[in-house]
Amino acid sequence: MNLVATLVLAALSLTPAHARPPVPNTPAPVTSTVSNVYDGDTFTLATGDRVRLRLVNTPELKPAEAYGIEAREATKAFLSGKPVQLAYGATQRDGYGRLLAAVKVGSDLLAVHLLERGLGHLFVIPPDETDMTPYLEAQERARAGKRGIWSTPEFQGSLHITSFHANADGDDRSNVNGEYLRVCNISSGPVQLAGFRIADISGASWDFPELIVPPGHTIKVHSGQGVHQLDPTEQLAIYLGSSDPIWNNKDDRATIYDRYGKVVDTRTHSVQKEGR
C-alpha cells in the first residue's frame, strides 16, 4: 500500500461514524427558486443550498406523522415555480449546513401560511429576535378551528415531544447525555415547568426543575448530569441527573405529566418505528 493510500485510510478511521457534513462557507442567498421540497419545513434551492424553514416545525414524513404529507404538499404549492425571498437571523446555518431562513413569496410568509392551516407549530431556534405576534396569532386561529395537527390527540397539551433520542451514539453508559428528548411549548403563553415530571415505560420518573419556557421554544431534556441552561436567548437544556442511561434502546415510552398528574404528552421509541 502506498503512502497516500495509507494516509487516506488513517484519516477515515478517525472520522466519527455519525459525523455531520461540513458546513458550507458560501454566501447565503437572499433570493432564489426552489428545486425540491423534502417535507413541510425542508427544501432545496436552485443554488443547491438546503433550507430549514425558521419559526415552524411541521410533521415528519419518516416516521410518518399525521398531516406530514399535507404539510409537504402545502409547501410545494406555495413555493413551486416562484421566486422566493430568504431572511436570516443571528445564525444563518445549522449544524447540518442547512440555511435557517424565513421564506417569503411576495409579501406572504411560508411559516405563517403553514401555521394558519394547522400544518405545523411555532418552533423557535434561539437566538431569534423576530416579532412572534403574527406567528402566534396564526397558530391560535388554527388551534381554535381545530385545523390540521390541532385536531389530533398529540397536540392537546401545552408541551409536545418533537424528538426522542433514546439511543445515544456509541456506548450509552459512557454517553448518558447523548440520550435526550426535545420538548416544545406549543401553547400560546409561557409554561412554568416546576411540578412537571417525565416518566419511562416502567413508571420511574424524574422531576423537571423550575424553568419558564416561552411559547415556541424547546427544551433539550438530557438523561445525565450537567448544569441547566435556563436562559431563553439560548437553547434551553435541563439534565435529569442520572449516572446511568434511562431509556431502553429497543422499546420505551416517555410521558410528561403536569403538576396535577395529568398527561401532557407521550412519545414512544421503537427500533421498528424509528428505523434503528
Annotate each PLM feature.
Residues 14-276:
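Small beta-barrel nucleic-acid-binding modules, primarily SNase/OB-fold domains
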Residues 2-13:
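Bacterial N-terminal signal peptides
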